[in-house]
């Protein structure tokens, strides 16, 4: 494989010295970029874009042509795994993802296959290989998956949810069925991420978008336990380099200590967690990624820079910080404001690495 020219992101995740704080943005390949909208229109629809390796590669690289980002993230969707299990994923205008055959009971769980990453999910691996080739070693490529709990919410609710009553009903009335589903998902995600690593992903991230809707006890049993199983099963070295793993539970700032015990390399923070407090609590065990409020990108450039400076000062001197937003970039943000953000992180962070 090509020598990596910029390994700042990987070094920061492993709490090794860097010259400036590395930065990337969740959903950096997305609808705020006019060029993304053009490519998506060419593909026809969202899943066709995900399933075409050349087009998925194109949208992955688009933000890197605009901004000096320190990592690329595979363009895909967390729902590829449930889709490959045969639940019939489709997108309803204005409603987001839906499944034609949601999981309602243990019998449904028993029928679900564990997808072969090189078969049903082969299009994702083709995209990873294509992107790695086209990156030419400029920056590392991040692979990712949804967490078992987060995937289960979509599979049981039949799509997006605000109250999560359907899955919580299963959790409390039929916990055995939910544990069986989560166990199958943990096995599927482990295979899926390991296949991404073998195909060329140089770091991986597990997105637990909905872990924060659980009580502390339920989070441990129904979300964190299964992420821990995945971390235990991941390839941690490939191509002679360590493959760092980041866990991100949105709304999970109160559980950082428990998350750091999983053996992951880094934790993602949303904007509701104070990064100085997070570093005091777990900074001796894991790197931290985050955590500017994505809505800050609506602010004037001077205010964006001020917020970047505040977060950098909060983390302080030394290693182990990857700058990011606290969740995905919003689709109506001005691309120029994203540029201000990235430039400010590099310029203002230099003093913390001397």
Swiss-Prot record:
Protein residues bound to substrate: 27-31, 77, 154, 209, 327
Localisation per UniProt entry: Cytoplasm
Pathway(s) it belongs to: Porphyrin-containing compound metabolism; protoporphyrin-IX biosynthesis; coproporphyrinogen-III from 5-aminolevulinate: step 4/4
Protein name: Uroporphyrinogen decarboxylase
Family: Belongs to the uroporphyrinogen decarboxylase family.
Enzyme class: lyase
Subunit structure: Homodimer.
Keywords from the named record: Cytoplasm, Decarboxylase, Lyase, Porphyrin biosynthesis
Function field: Catalyzes the decarboxylation of four acetate groups of uroporphyrinogen-III to yield coproporphyrinogen-III.
GO biological process, one term: protoporphyrinogen IX biosynthetic process from glutamate
Originating organism: Escherichia coli O6:K15:H31 (strain 536 / UPEC)
Cellular component per GO, a single term: cytosol
GO molecular function: uroporphyrinogen decarboxylase activity
UniProt-listed InterPro entries: UROD/MetE-like_sf, Uroporphyrinogen_deCO2ase_HemE, Uroporphyrinogen_deCOase
HAMAP family linked to this entry: URO_D (MF_00218)
SUPFAM superfamilies per the UniProt record, alphabetical: UROD/MetE-like (SSF51726)
One Pfam family named in its UniProt record: URO-D
Main location class: cytoplasm
Entry EC no(s): 4.1.1.37
Chain coiled-coil ranges: none
């Amino acid at each position: 494989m090509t020598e990596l020219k910029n390994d700042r992101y990987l070094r920061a995740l492993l709490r090794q010295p860097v010259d400036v704080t590395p930065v990337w943005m969740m959903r950096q390949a997305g609808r705020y970029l006019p060029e993304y909208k053009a490519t998506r229109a060419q593909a026809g629809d969202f899943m066709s874009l995900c399933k075409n390796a050349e087009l998925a590669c194109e949208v992955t690289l688009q933000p890197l042509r605009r901004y000096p980002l320190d990592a690329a993230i595979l363009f895909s969707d967390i729902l590829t795994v449930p889709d490959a299990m045969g639940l019939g994923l489709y997108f309803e205008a204005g409603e987001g993802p839906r499944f034609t055959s949601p999981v309602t009971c243990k019998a449904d769980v028993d029928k679900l296959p564990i997808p072969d990453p090189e078969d049903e999910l082969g299009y994702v691996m083709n995209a990873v290989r294509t992107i790695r080739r086209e990156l030419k070693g400029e920056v590392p490529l991040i692979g990712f998956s949804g967490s078992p709990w987060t995937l289960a919410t979509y599979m049981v609710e039949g799509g997006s949810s605000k109250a999560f009553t359907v899955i919580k009903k299963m959790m409390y009335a039929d916990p055995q069925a939910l544990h069986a589903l989560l166990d199958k998902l943990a096995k599927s995600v482990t295979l899926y991420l390991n296949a991404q690593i073998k195909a060329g992903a140089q770091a991986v991230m597990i997105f637990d978008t909905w872990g924060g809707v659980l009580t502390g006890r339920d989070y441990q049993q129904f979300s964190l336990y299964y992420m821990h199983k995945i971390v235990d099963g991941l390839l941690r070295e490939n191509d002679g380099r360590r493959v760092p793993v980041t866990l991100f539970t949105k709304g999970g700032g109160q559980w950082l200590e428990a998350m750091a015990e999983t053996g992951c390399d880094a934790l993602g923070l949303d904007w509701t967690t104070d990064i100085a407090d997070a570093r005091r609590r777990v900074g001796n065990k894991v790197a931290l990624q985050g955590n500017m409020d994505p809505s800050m990108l609506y602010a004037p450039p001077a205010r964006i820079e001020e917020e970047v400076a505040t977060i950098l000062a909060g983390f302080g001197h030394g290693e182990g910080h990857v700058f990011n937003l606290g969740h995905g970039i919003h689709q109506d943000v001005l691309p120029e404001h994203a540029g201000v953000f990235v430039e400010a992180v590099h310029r203002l962070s230099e003093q913390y690495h001397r």
